[in-house]
């Protein structure tokens, strides 16, 4: 599982979903959580926090947002050398096989379909951590 001091960026255009994700993370013990309302704002925060000790260590992003979709942000993250191994979880209502395949091919760490339970959310974060921290 991600250490409790992990710096997490939550990106969703719906404040209620951002609050749900933040509250779920807080209930799991995480405190260092920032948020963005769309992919563009998320990218700006990633760029602002790009020096050692300030970098985000986990991104949880919605797929469908204005300005920049989560999948487009994921592709930019994976194309940037410094972020190539950044755990990136897509949280979305998209569950069609083609969309899941597209996300996997783009390098998503885990894919969580809304609505989700706290248990599924935690299990997916554990899997994302394991994927990026293989011994």
Regions found by a protein language model. Give the residues of each.
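Two-component/phosphorelay signaling modules centered on CheY-like receiver
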Residues: 15-34
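Alpha4 helix (beta4-alpha4-beta5 surface) of REC/receiver domains from two-component response regulators
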Residues: 22, 72, 95-110
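Helix N-cap/capping motif at the beta->alpha junctions
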Residues: 35-48, 70
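Active-site residues of response regulator receiver
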Residues: 62, 92
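Short amphipathic alpha-helix used as the core "switch/output" element in two-component signaling
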Residues: 71-84
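C-terminal output helix
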Residues: 116-125
């Amino acid at each position: 599982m991600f250490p409790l001091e992990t710096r997490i960026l939550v990106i969703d255009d719906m404040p209620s979903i951002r609050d749900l994700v933040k509250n779920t993370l807080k209930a799991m013990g995480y405190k260092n959580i920032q948020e963005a309302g769309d992919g563009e704002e998320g990218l700006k925060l990633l760029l602002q926090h790009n020096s050692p000790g300030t970098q985000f260590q986990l991104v949880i992003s919605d797929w469908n947002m204005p300005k920049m979709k989560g999948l487009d942000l994921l592709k930019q993250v994976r194309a940037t050398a410094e972020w190539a191994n950044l755990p990136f979880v897509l949280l979305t209502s998209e569950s069609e096989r083609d969309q899941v395949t597209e996300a996997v091919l783009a390098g998503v760490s885990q894919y969580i379909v809304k609505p989700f339970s706290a248990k599924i959310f935690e299990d997916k974060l554990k899997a994302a951590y394991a994927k990026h921290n293989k011994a």
